[in-house]
A protein has these predicted regions:
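Extracellular recognition modules
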Residues: 20-24
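Residue-level detection of beta-strand-connecting loop/turn positions
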Residues: 25-27, 62-64, 167
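Serine/threonine-rich, repeat-prone extracellular segments and beta-strand-based repeat modules
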Residues: 2-19
């Protein structure tokens, strides 16, 4: 902390308003902004790439002045959005700088976990579409096993924050949870499959419902989908039957049965 002097005396600060501040140790005037959002600061000597994670240090000050400080691994995420100037990233909290072990951390009142997304929202001029859509979805949809798993969520929660990377301001990001077994409260494999999770990994025949390629349970990918859970066993039969129904069912059968097949 360094002493500083405002160029013009102020009695009340306003978020988003620029203030000129003189810092003697630099013998310079800087522009200072106040924000009502949490502030993230990530520093790393390494180039951040799309895998593997590189070591970095994470520090966040929440609006209640709580501070989270930890070593992390960080990498770029996304597909075509990696070509944009402002990158989305994912971070993994580490117990130390080696990354040999991860640790669960609670951020911004969201879940406690070691994996988090930092959404850049570069293609959203108002930075509201992704967050609002996810909020609306969670308010509208309840999964069919909600009664037995009241904490299960078929979606993610996101919170706004302002991000600095190596002391350079990157703009507003959304800190977000991940859709995974933990979020959905899927049961662990215990000799049989009790819940499945797939990811649409690419635009292919099955993900676009344009074709029905054959599948192999020896592969974790099929028709543009990636099999995410469980790790112990792969069975594409349920998803194959669903895609088959969408593509090949006669209209009258589709309209009679789709409501039972899609929760």
């Amino acid at each position: 902390n360094e002493p500083c002097t405002f160029s013009t005396p102020i009695h009340q600060v306003e978020a988003g308003k620029p203030y000129d501040v003189f810092i003697p140790s630099y013998n310079s005037v800087f522009t200072l902004y106040f924000t009502e959002l949490p502030i993230l600061s990530i520093s790393t000597p390494y180039e951040i790439v799309d895998e593997p994670y590189v070591q970095a240090h994470f520090r966040m000050m929440e609006t209640n002045q709580a501070i989270v400080s930890s070593f992390i691994g960080i990498q770029i995420r996304g597909g075509w959005t990696q070509t944009l100037p402002k990158k989305s990233m994912e971070i993994e909290f580490w117990t130390d700088s080696t990354g040999a072990e991860t640790q669960d951390v609670s951020l911004l009142g969201l879940r406690t976990d070691d994996d988090w997304n930092l959404q850049a929202m570069y293609n959203e001029p108002l930075r509201i579409r992704s967050k609002t859509n996810n909020d609306l979805w969670l308010s509208m949809h309840k999964i069919h096993y909600q009664q037995s798993e009241p904490d299960a969520m078929n979606g993610i929660r996101m919170k706004y924050a302002e991000l600095f990377l190596n002391h350079e301001y990157q703009g507003v990001y959304c800190v977000g949870e991940k859709i995974d077994r933990k979020q959905l409260r899927l049961k662990n494999h215990n000799g049989s499959i009790s819940g499945e999770l797939y990811k649409g990994a690419g635009w292919d025949g099955a993900t676009t419902f344009h074709s029905l390629p054959p599948y192999s349970n020896n592969s974790r990918v099929w028709g543009g989908f990636e099999y995410k859970h469980p790790d112990e066993e792969t069975d594409w039969a349920n998803l194959y039957d669903l895609v088959d129904f969408v593509i090949n069912a006669p209209d009258h059968q589709f309209y009679e049965e789709y409501d039972d097949r899609f929760e």
